[in-house]
């Protein structure tokens, strides 16, 4: 099989996955309807995110950017579609946000062509994840999420220690985001006050 045929096969297999109809499971408890297939997996991420599709730079068509998982999405019904801001976790266990949409919220979720470009706060984050969305009457969609940063009190050379804080951003189109200052809460300090 030549390179072009392999690329076509990747896209064809991807389209089968994306367009697969999701059916309810036979057993149900009368309260929750569970479906046979997850609505999003790492395999749903666009082929062109994962592969360099240029035969000159990737002659063996090896996956270049591994995706580990899609999880913990914020959801909203927006412009008549079910839209998720998905935590996409790379093989390096670092996460980024990407938008996927579906006409019915059950199947046919498709990622937008580009992941979310989230502006940094004053102190850059090493990882961001688990956004929740709220459409506000002021016309903005607000996203609250977790931002991890290197722990400044960690011993020298310890790159695994991190602090986690709430972070907030807003958008009107889910493409262009404005980062707002991280919320500050002093209530978590009460247990330590003397």
Feature map (PLM): residue ranges:
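N-terminal regions that are enriched for targeting/export leaders
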Residues: 1-64, 68-73
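Beta-propeller and closely related beta-sheet repeat lectin domains
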Residues: 71-74, 127-132, 193
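Residue-level detector of Asp-centered blade-edge/turn motifs that repeat once per structural unit
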Residues: 77-79, 135-138
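Entry beta-strands of beta-propeller and related beta-repeat scaffolds
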Residues: 81-83, 139-143
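Short glycine/acidic-enriched loop and turn motifs that connect beta-strands
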Residues: 89-93, 148-152
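Beta-propeller blade signature
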Residues: 98-105, 164-173
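Blade-edge beta-strand/turn elements of extracellular beta-propeller
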Residues: 107-119, 174-186
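Conserved small/polar residues in nucleotide/adenosyl-binding loops
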Residues: 187-194
């Amino acid at each position: 099989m030549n390179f072009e045929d392999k690329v076509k096969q990747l896209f064809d297999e991807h389209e089968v996955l994306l367009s697969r109809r999701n059916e309810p499971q036979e057993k149900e408890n009368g309260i929750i309807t569970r479906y046979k297939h997850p609505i999003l997996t790492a395999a749903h991420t666009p082929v062109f995110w994962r592969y360099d599709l240029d035969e000159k730079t990737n002659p063996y068509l090896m996956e270049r950017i591994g995706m580990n998982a899609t999880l913990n999405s914020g959801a909203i019904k927006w412009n008549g579609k079910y839209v998720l801001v998905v935590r996409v976790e790379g093989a390096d266990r670092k996460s980024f946000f990407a938008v996927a949409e579906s006409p019915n919220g059950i199947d046919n979720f498709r990622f937008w062509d580009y992941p979310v470009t989230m502006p940094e706060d004053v102190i850059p984050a090493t990882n961001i994840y688990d956004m929740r969305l709220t459409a506000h009457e002021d016309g903005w969609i607000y996203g609250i999420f977790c931002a991890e940063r290197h722990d400044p009190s960690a011993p020298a050379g310890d790159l695994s220690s991190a602090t986690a804080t709430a972070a907030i951003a807003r958008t009107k189109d889910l493409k262009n985001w404005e980062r707002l200052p991280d919320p500050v809460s002093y209530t978590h300090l009460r247990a330590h006050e003397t």
